[in-house]
């Protein structure tokens, strides 16, 4: 699921999974 967040923009990621959004911001 984290991979999906990375593929999608942070804004969309935060909607699906907050941790994925945070991870992309850190990276």
Curated annotation (Swiss-Prot):
Region of interest (Important for interaction with SLC2A1 and SLC2A3), ranges: 15-21
Bilayer topology: Single-pass membrane protein
Main location class: membrane
Pfam families: SMIM43 (PF21976)
GO cellular component: plasma membrane
Assigned keywords, A-Z: Cell membrane, Membrane
GO biological process, one term: mesendoderm development
Compartments where located: Cell membrane
Function: Required for mesendoderm differentiation. Interacts with glucose transporters and promotes glucose uptake. Probably augments the glucose uptake capacity of glucose transporter proteins to meet the energy needs of mesendoderm differentiation.
Oligomer and partners: Interacts with glucose transporters SLC2A1/GLUT1 and SLC2A3/GLUT3; the interactions may promote SLC2A1- and SLC2A3-mediated glucose transport to meet the energy needs of mesendoderm differentiation.
Protein known as: Small integral membrane protein 43
Species of the source: Pongo abelii (Sumatran orangutan)
